[in-house]
Amino acid sequence: RQAPVGGNEAMVPISYETRVAADAAIAAAPRSQAAQGDQDVALTPDPQTGNGWHLQALRALEAQGVDVMRAPVTVGIMDQSVDDTVPDLVGQVDHDKSVSCSFNGIPNRDPAAWRWDDATHGTHVAGSIAAKHDGVGVDGVNPTLRIAAINVASRNGGFFYPEYIVCGFVWAAEHGISVTNGSYYVDPWKYWLPNDPEQAAGQEAVQRAVDYATSKDVINVVAAGNFSTDLDNLPTTDDSAPGDTWGAHERDVTGAVYMPPKLRGTLSVSALQLPEGADPATGVLEPASWSNWGATSVDFAAPGAKIYAPLTSWYGKAYGNLYGTSQASPLAAAVIATLRQVHPEMNAEQIIALAKKQAGDPANWDRLKPVEGREYRGAGLPN
């Protein structure tokens, strides 16, 4: 699947020639006063960083310039793969903490197993979090974070099966990974029925794996999904599954669970878009039309439309825009991981409380446009 989370996710690659021409103009242009903020250290963004409105929305560039002690923190990218050969990710991926779980859920540390150049989703996610600050390309939200590639998708089709997901959470728990990002839903069922003997074991196994990671102080951030669905009131019928073979059929899904956003121990993130003409640093943001929502099911709302980050080497020296809650959740994960850097004395529960407190600050909360009958904001905008 091109869109691991599912729904209306899309990619818009930017040609190398266009980027080269843009680099010179962007590098020569001064940063806006709104984006500069109160910095302790002068920071010149990488040339194409101006394409990333999300960095201004999260005040990420200001945070990068703050001179503060930062503890080492690794974010686990539970996704298709991460191509650490692209320029902005060279040196950002910790090979000792990276793994593929995509063969029967058995860990394989061979880089060839977790580094694919023909599946760009995980690379884009990793780059949006931690693309390095090196004078070329773009900046991630926090280039000082480390990345662990945790491949939890099949090579053919990009399916995310329970045994792969279990392997990923257990690996993160046992290898010192502080935060995971999960931009996917669990295959082959869109909605898992806990009373169906063919589905109950898979659902329970994934829930136990999340519980295990939580017990090891891991914070697990996940995409809310792209089906324009109220996660508080899931549909009672579905005709999209099983999704990995012919024969999808309508079935009763009353009482089903949508994994992972509805699992205990996950933080679910909905997607925001920038209205035309709005200032990304100060303007009011609105929910993307395709984003899932839910007053009790969503924890944060973060930018998820037109998110600019690196693509795999298969595309050449390329960057591109992706759209989806797959892009929103890594931005929230990056903010949470930054809090873990700055507050190593805090446990996961305390960090989550702090992240929600900051997201709900009026300076952040008031930027989220309320929508009647569609509560998508969670605690607010991570910052």
Model-derived features with residue positions:
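Protease zymogen maturation seam
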Residues: 2-74, 82, 87-88, 92
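Active-site-proximal beta-strand/loop segments in catalytic clefts of secreted hydrolases
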Residues: 16, 37-39, 77-81, 128-132, ...
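Loop/turn elements at helix/coil->beta-strand transitions in domains of secreted/extracellular proteins
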Residues: 32-33, 70-75, 143-148, 174-180, ...
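Surface-exposed intrinsically disordered loops and tails
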Residues: 44-52, 100-118, 188-201, 230-259, ...
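Active-site-proximal loop motif in hydrolases
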Residues: 65-85, 96-137, 150-163, 193-201, ...
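Substrate-binding/access-modulating region of protease and related hydrolase catalytic domains
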Residues: 152-263, 313-330, 342, 375
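C-terminal subdomain of the subtilisin-like protease fold in secreted/lumenal serine endopeptidases
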Residues: 175-184, 341-383
